[in-house]
C-alpha cells in the first residue's frame, strides 16, 4: 500500500492464516461500500480471500458486533461514517464508537482497527472512502493496520 502525505508505506505481507472479520455500517451506502471494497482488496492482497463480513445499520452498533467477532477472529476491521450535523449527536456517536472499539480491542487483546470516518462533511468522507476520485482509502488502511497488528501480536506471543 503506497502512502501519501504522512501515510506510511506498508510493504506487502502474508496474512493468509489470519482470521479476519470486517464489520461495516450501511448509513451513507456509497461511502461504506467503498470502504468495504478497499478493505476486501487489502485482505485479498494479503492472502485472505473470504474474510467474515457483517453489515450493521449505523456506527453505534459497530462496537458490540466487533466485540462478538473478536471471539473467533484474529483481527477485526470497523468501517463506517459519521458526518457532523447541526446537533451534538455527532460528538456523542463519535466518542461512543471510538471508546467502544478501543475497549473491545484492549479487553479482547485482539486488534480492532477503527476505519469509522468522522468528518465535517460528506465531501470529506468521499475523499477518504477509496473511490477513484478519493485521495485516501481508509478501508484499506484500517485493514492493513489490523492485519499487521495481528501478525505483530502473534510474533510477540510466540516469543513469550
Swiss-Prot record:
Active site: 89 (proton donor)
Record keywords, A-Z: Riboflavin biosynthesis, Transferase
Pathway: Cofactor biosynthesis; riboflavin biosynthesis; riboflavin from 2-hydroxy-3-oxobutyl phosphate and 5-amino-6-(D-ribitylamino)uracil: step 1/2
Catalytic activity field: (2S)-2-hydroxy-3-oxobutyl phosphate + 5-amino-6-(D-ribitylamino)uracil = 6,7-dimethyl-8-(1-D-ribityl)lumazine + phosphate + 2 H2O + H(+)
InterPro entries tied to this protein: LS, LS/RS, LS/RS_sf
The enzyme's E.C. designation: 2.5.1.78
UniProt function note: Catalyzes the formation of 6,7-dimethyl-8-ribityllumazine by condensation of 5-amino-6-(D-ribitylamino)uracil with 3,4-dihydroxy-2-butanone 4-phosphate. This is the penultimate step in the biosynthesis of riboflavin.
Lineage, highest ranks first: Bacteria, Bacillati, Actinomycetota, Actinomycetes, Mycobacteriales
Subunit (UniProt): Homopentamer.
GO cellular component, as recorded: cytosol; riboflavin synthase complex
Swiss-Prot/TrEMBL GO biological process terms: riboflavin biosynthetic process
Underlying gene: ribH
Similarity comment: family membership: Belongs to the DMRL synthase family.
Organism: Mycobacterium marinum (strain ATCC BAA-535 / M)
Cited NCBIfam families: lumazine-synth
SUPFAM superfamilies: Lumazine synthase
Gene Ontology molecular function, alphabetical: 6,7-dimethyl-8-ribityllumazine synthase activity
Official protein name in the record: 6,7-dimethyl-8-ribityllumazine synthase
Binding site for 5-amino-6-(D-ribitylamino)uracil: 27, 59-61, 81-83, 114
UniProt binding sites for (2S)-2-hydroxy-3-oxobutyl phosphate: 86-87, 128
